[in-house]
């Protein structure tokens, strides 16, 4: 195969990887919930999974209540929801 053909194949495989959604059958349902700061007035850095962007993002957590889409570290969020 020529080098041009290899680059074309690599480009197509990369495009397929980007456009093909990750299977969400094993992802917990709470990963689909919106970020919820809760009712307390604290200001704590937290992370939530954003299902449209398929990544974990930062938000400010108040310190109580909220929902389960709330992680102390981005790594914990990625392990739970983005894997």
Swiss-Prot record:
Q: Using the chain's own numbering, where are the disulfide bonds? A: 31-81, 40-64, 56-77
Tissue-specificity statement: Expressed by the venom gland.
| S-adenosyl-L-methionine as UniProt keyword | no
Name the domain of life. Eukaryota
Question: Does the keyword Zinc-finger belong to this entry?
Answer: no
Annotated site, Reactive bond for trypsin, chain positions: 41-42
**Which Pfam family name is an example for this entry?**
Kunitz_BPTI
Write out the similarity annotation: Belongs to the venom Kunitz-type family.
| Biological role stated in the UniProt entry | Serine protease inhibitor.
Per its record, how is this protein called by name?
A: Kunitz-type serine protease inhibitor mulgin-2
